Design a protein with these regions (language model features):
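Rossmann-like S-adenosyl-L-methionine
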Residues: 1-132
């Protein structure tokens, strides 16, 4: 939602139906009319959108703890968005996902965030740019 004022259209994919309902409510509350949200398996929904002709300039992936699903990584490589932002709560899984994505993307920057001081938990955000 935070990118909606800079985008022609924002399409959010989310496994959790309650999160989709919250996103729709927040978009409405903030008068964001260029947003749509789809609930269900993210890889399946994103593939369906790609087949319908959606071609994103920017993709933000914020997967569950297990990391980005291999099917979704394959789709991300196929979509070839100019910019990919990968969010992770597990640095090891982020490293694994970035290695897989390196086939089509170059890592520009990785920034850790200590949202939970004095705990071993760290969030990381990686900025990737499409190769070629």
């Amino acid at each position: 939602l935070f990118l909606a004022d800079r985008a022609l259209h924002v399409h959010g994919f989310e496994q959790c139906r309650e999160a989709v309902a919250c996103a729709r409510s927040n978009a409405k509350r903030n008068k964001l009319h260029n947003c749509s949200f789809t609930a269900g398996d993210v890889a399946v929904q994103a593939k369906r959108a790609a087949r319908a002709g959606e071609s994103p300039d920017i993709v933000i992936a914020d997967p569950p703890r297990a990391g980005i699903d291999p099917k979704l990584i394959a789709l991300l490589l196929e979509l070839r968005a100019k910019i990919l932002v990968a969010v992770s709560c597990d640095p090891a899984r982020l490293a694994r996902d970035l290695a897989r994505l390196s086939e089509g993307y170059q890592v520009q920057h990785v920034q850790p965030f200590d949202f939970f001081p004095r705990t071993p938990h760290v969030e990381s955000v990686a900025l990737l740019v499409r190769r070629g």
